[in-house]
Amino acid sequence: MGIDEASVVHNSFQLDRKVSMLKTELNVDALVEQYLSGKEYSVAILRSLKTGELQAYPIELSSPKDSDGNSMLSKSVKSNDAEYVSPVKLGKAKDKICKLAIDSFKALGGKSYGRIDIRCNDEGKAYFLEANLIPGLIQKTGYFP
């Protein structure tokens, strides 16, 4: 909600303008966070019926860069189907993303299935963005396998 090209700010004037817009137009408070310019992932979490273990299925989400060179999944990008979804290659990065997703899911009390969104900084350090413990299962809009 309210995420657009003006969401990444570089000074207090831009910050004040964006926060005021959110308050005035959407009647919501602003959550201000550091912009993470690395890759973004959506990780489906499923509990195996056979083993009972949690399994993680990450996909990488990317979108066209805006005029400032930032990439974000804004409402406009999603509504125009401009995001790209690709599999995550095997390796340490995938293992790290899957571990963070499963740990986050457990910490939030997730039981059977859910989706965890993660974004990395420039150095590749992964950060929890949000959880959807009742994710949409519609393939086109749900980012769930």
Where are the regions that the model predicts?
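ATP-dependent carboxylate activation and anion-phosphoryl transfer catalytic cores
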Residues: G91-P145
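Short, functionally important structural connectors and interaction interfaces within domains
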Residues: M1, N27-V28, N80, F105, ...
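Gly/Ser/Thr-rich beta-alpha loop segments that engage phosphate groups in nucleotides
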Residues: D4, E40, L137-I138
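Phosphate-binding site of ATP-dependent enzymes
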Residues: S12-K92, K99, C120-Y127
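Hydrophobic pocket-lining residues within nucleotide cofactor-binding pockets
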Residues: V9, L36, L137
